[in-house]
Design a protein with these regions (language model features):
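Hydrophobic or amphipathic alpha-helical targeting/insertion segments
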Residues: 96-133
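Small/polar beta-strand repeat architecture
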Residues: 123-180, 186-198, 203-302
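Short beta-strand elements that form the blades of beta-propeller/WD-repeat-like
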Residues: 70-76, 103-107, 312-317, 354-356, ...
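Structural motif
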Residues: 78-81, 112-118, 319-330, 369-375, ...
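Beta-sheet repeat architectures centered on beta-propellers
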Residues: 1-70, 391-395, 402-406, 413, ...
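Blade-loop segments of beta-propeller domains
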Residues: 62-63, 77, 82-101
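Beta-propeller and closely related beta-pinwheel folds
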Residues: 56, 297-441
Length: 607
């Protein structure tokens, strides 16, 4: 009986990686993905290569904000720098910055810098009109050029060693002549220090022609004398500035403090200004002289996030969304029934606003669990739509960046991409890892995000938007990013330096890097006998490379190392071994491009 010939099965399998992916911390890994990376880039995809070099732009003492508008803007402590020059003072701390026309606006300081006029100033303004100095007509408000006022010192003072039997006249009233500054004291009664009480008015060891003291306390001392605590008042000549120095026609100002003419309190729009006279709409005031101290204010809301869209500054405060008057970041309360008016709307969703940004023809206001989308071109046309979607994580308001009409941001569960519909989670490869306090920027192609991990360590990741690859560059803690003239800048929160990305290695020198490939188990049961494994890499002159292997969860052991002063292509053999699974870790310093990884194996028994 003739039987057919059977071909002997060698059981050999061959697999190769010629396309390397990014990091993948999840269970769903694929050939070419990395369990960990450091100092790597996808710039030479499909190969693995090192990140570009970095160079120092400038050193700062305590920088907290970076912004680009024609030149770099930096907040260093309390200094606001534009193009390397200090142009104004702000409070220390984090900032939200946006630009409208030629004005760079800064919150929470409510300040601005005009790049054209080189003026640094305040968006808000206040103008006190002291008691008896403000005069109203039916449509005007005026103050005199000069007037003596009763000015109280801010800090209390004391006088010590006052004899218990000293006779001091205590008055019940004091007034200042507005024209001459002369003091008139009324209701005088002689008292001794033990009898003085809070609120008594005295003139003790002061210039009685223009000063008096309001008693705060009178206390017996150990030597039998008394110490009198007081607040000093002085008749001071006050010169009122022209209203043009603080206000402009069209400003909405809040008038408060009117007691004699209480009807005049409220918000009104200035129609014209002439020196120390403001003109408003007809017949809105009660005419007369106001006895109270009047405060005139151009108010600006305390916005916690801001952006610019369609020539308005948008922002959020509490549950309210605000928009400035058209082209005017100083006015948020102008309601004149015009298309140029300010705008405000309260929303009823839970939680605080966590960020806002202009996107396409809309403005997006984010919370952690929703987004409010505002459509329209002017206040009467504005409509707000609310969508329950994953929003921006609290503390990650600076993670917003737009690349090719896609908005990227950090949410609670990871990094999302938004294109107008439902946001898409693009960080599934992070698995169960969670990150916080993200700050991000872009070079126009890649999304750079610096964030804190579960144990508080900072990590800088880069997402290649063209290839959907995540790589960890290093442990940089970036306080802010800015993109200017083709270069991405960031503030290093640890060193206080402003750094430039995408540079050569002239300043940094050869950089260290590490790539740990995800575990190889060939997705089959049984121990595998590897007959051949090798890597192919191109190395620049002076670079070095080390290869290590870990089998069945054991420690890494070195299997190859090379260093050469000349550029070369190397083929790295890895000694065959029988195991269920293994990992490969590559590390080095200098330019080294990993091109492929080939392995041949046969599957044996499970033991």
């Amino acid at each position: 009986m003739k039987l057919p010939y059977l071909t002997a099965a060698t059981g050999k399998n061959r697999k190769q990686i010629i396309t390397f992916g990014g990091v993948n911390y999840s269970r769903d890994t694929h050939d070419g993905e990395l369990l960990e990376s450091f100092g790597l880039s996808s710039a030479q995809f499909p190969c693995l290569s090192q990140r570009a070099g970095r160079k120092k732009y400038a050193d700062y003492t305590s920088p907290t904000a970076l912004y680009a508008r024609g030149k770099l803007c930096v907040v260093d402590g309390t200094d606001f720098l534009y193009g390397g020059k200090v142009v104004g003072q702000v409070t220390a701390g984090e900032k939200h910055i946006a630009t409208i026309n030629t004005k760079i606006v800064i919150f929470p300081d409510k300040a601005y810098y005009d790049t054209e006029t080189e003026e640094f100033g305040s968006l808000g303004a206040s103008y006190p009109g002291y008691a008896g100095d403000v005069t109203f007509t039916a449509n005007t408000l005026a103050v005199p050029e000069k007037s003596y006022i009763d000015q109280a010192y801010e800090d209390a003072a004391t006088v010590s060693g006052v004899d218990a039997g000293a006779s001091i006249t205590a008055y019940t009233g004091a007034s200042v002549n507005k024209s001459t500054g002369a003091l008139t004291m009324t209701g005088g009664t002689a008292k001794n220090p033990p009898d003085l009480k809070a609120g008594d008015i005295i003139q003790y060891e002061c210039d009685s022609s223009k000063e008096y003291m309001v008693v705060q306390s009178s206390a017996l001392q150990s030597d039998g004398t008394y110490q009198i605590g007081y607040v000093l008042h002085e008749a001071v000549l006050h010169e009122y500035p022209n209203f043009e120095e603080l206000f402009s026609a069209g400003d909405a100002i809040d008038i408060s403090g009117c007691t004699t003419l209480a009807k005049n309190n409220g918000s009104h729009i200035i129609r014209s200004i002439s020196g120390r006279t403001l003109t408003f709409d007809k017949d809105i005031f009660a005419a007369g002289s106001e006895a109270g101290t009047v405060m005139l204010e151009r108010k600006v809301p305390d916005l916690t996030c801001i952006c610019e869209c369609d020539n308005r500054i948008w922002g959020a405060e509490g549950t309210t969304i605000w928009a400035s008057a058209l082209g005017d970041p100083k006015n948020f309360y102008v309601y004149d029934g015009l298309a140029t008016d300010s705008y405000a709307v309260a929303v009823g969703t839970d939680g605080a606003f966590t960020g806002c940004i202009a996107y396409s023809s809309t403005v997006l206001f984010w919370k952690e669990n929703c987004v409010h989308k505002i459509l329209g071109s002017y206040p009467a046309q504005y409509e707000i739509y609310t969508y329950t979607v994953p929003g921006i994580q609290e503390g990650s308001e600076k993670s917003l960046a737009i690349i090719n009409e896609t908005l990227f941001y950090k949410g609670r569960s990871g990094v999302y991409a938004y294109s107008g519909g439902t946001p898409e989670l693009i960080s599934e490869n992070f698995g169960t890892r969670r990150f916080y306090d993200a700050v991000a920027g872009t070079d126009g192609e890649r999304y750079y995000i610096s964030m804190r991990d579960e144990v508080g360590e900072w990590e800088l990741y880069v997402f290649d938007t063209l290839r959907a690859i995540w790589l960890r560059e290093d442990n940089t803690h970036a306080a802010d990013f800015a993109y200017l003239d083709g270069t991405l800048y960031y503030l290093d929160a640890d060193t206080g330096k402003a750094m430039m990305c995408g540079q050569d290695y002239g300043e940094e020198g050869a950089i260290p890097w590490t790539a740990t490939l995800c575990q190889f188990d060939e997705t089959v049961h049984g121990r595998k006998g590897y007959s051949r494994m090798y890597l192919r890499a191109d190395m620049a002159a002076g670079a070095w490379l080390k290869a290590e292997i870990s089998t069945d969860g054991g420690p890494f052991r070195q299997v190859f190392a090379t260093h050469d002063e000349q550029a070369k292509t190397v083929q790295i053999p890895i000694l065959p071994v029988r195991c269920d699974n293994f990992r490969v870790r590559l590390s080095g310093k200098g330019v080294c491009v990993i091109k492929s990884f080939v392995r041949e194996f046969a599957v044996g028994s499970e033991y």
